[in-house]
Amino acid sequence: MKKIILAIMTLVLVFGSFVTVRADAPVDVATDGDAEAVVEATALEGGNEALQIQSKSVLLMELESGTVLYEKNADEMLRPASVTKVMTLLLIFEALERGDIALDDTVVVTEHAASMGGSQCFFEAGEEQTVQDMIKCIEVASGNDAAVAMAEHLAGSEAAFVQKMNERAKELGMEHTHFDNACGLEVETHLTSARDIAIMSRQLLLYHPDILTYSTIWMDSITHKTRRGESRFDLANTNKFLNLYTGANGLKTGYTSQAKYCMSATATRDGVTLIAVVMGAETKEVRNSEAMKLLDYGFAQCRTYVDTEVVPEDLQIPVKKGTCKSVPVKPVEQHTITLVAANPDQIEKQVIAYENLKAPIPEGDAVGVVQYSCNGTYIGEVMLYAEYPVPELNFRYSLSDIAGRIFMAK
């Protein structure tokens, strides 16, 4: 539906001058340098001095807006190791949301899944576990066998699931990614980039925040149920970063001899969530320290803006062919926006009503939007909804209205 800016003097007095809002692209900074040596990667224009980064590739992203705050070789295709499982988990949570599976569904481990090497939970063929426990095994213990078991449960085979992984990557705009398996075991053509890892991590966090329930588990356990009986198996979180950085809450680590140390690290402070992707670090100490360095830089750049008066109490949106000429909007208590390298004093907002809004309008129907901009760049919006229904003006109502006016005039 087209939109038109409301030219109402009272709104101008409340909100100030209206400005044109543009949906500009997020800050996207390219970098140069030798990936094998310590180089100065480029940060936000006008930001702090460039960071000293040893890892082959890094990227720092603000969750809410998707703004890239810092990057180095962010589009270089590298081996992601177990960070691959971010996509596996994304597809699992999307299947849960659609109702294709439920957390208490039973997953049967196949011979193929049980044969996975690397990090594993040592399932036996024929063993049964719930979807919820499989998610724990993937997110907490980074179990390759659990990831493949879930892939087969969802798609019938790992190959079919991998096809879905690649299709979803394409849909998300992950232009430097090709998956060959569901767990991240070494395959020459199994590659992705720091930018693409940030994209899928953001998708998982934004739309399936329940992942944090699992990613923040430090210790847990499952029960193996095999032909030999039952036995407890302890799960220890592979992401030790959780205890190293204040506010850390995820998301996935990875290591193979060729991929080196990788991580999609997430942390939240004062309402701001950041994603720091590190790929190709020579040691886990370098991986962790550079994730910390990126997050420290990001939190120094970000702040939270709270608008406590989104719209005036008497705001009315024009309506055509209705029993009244306008409709009030439902009150909006407040709206919070994460600002990246910006001053709250530079924020402007404008009320935009839907063009040619015609009755009938149900209660709660969208009738407009408040858009926020900073230095001319779109940074967010709040939808406006009708506070009560507006019936269509019909012949019977018109006669009644005319009769009422005549009576009142006497």
Task: Give residue spans per PLM region.
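A generic local structural motif
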Residues: 10, 44-46, 262
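Domain-terminus/edge residues, biased toward the C-terminal soluble/receptor-binding domains
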Residues: 174-178, 186-191, 195-410
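Sec-dependent N-terminal signal peptides of Gram-positive bacterial secreted proteins and lipoproteins
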Residues: 2-22
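Membrane-proximal envelope biogenesis segments
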Residues: 13, 25-40, 62-63, 68-71, ...
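Structural motif marking the loop-to-transmembrane transition
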Residues: 1-2, 80, 131, 395, ...
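Active-site-adjacent loops and short helices of periplasmic peptidoglycan-processing enzymes
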Residues: 21-209
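A mature extracytoplasmic/lumenal domain signature
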Residues: 10, 82-84, 111-113, 125-127, ...
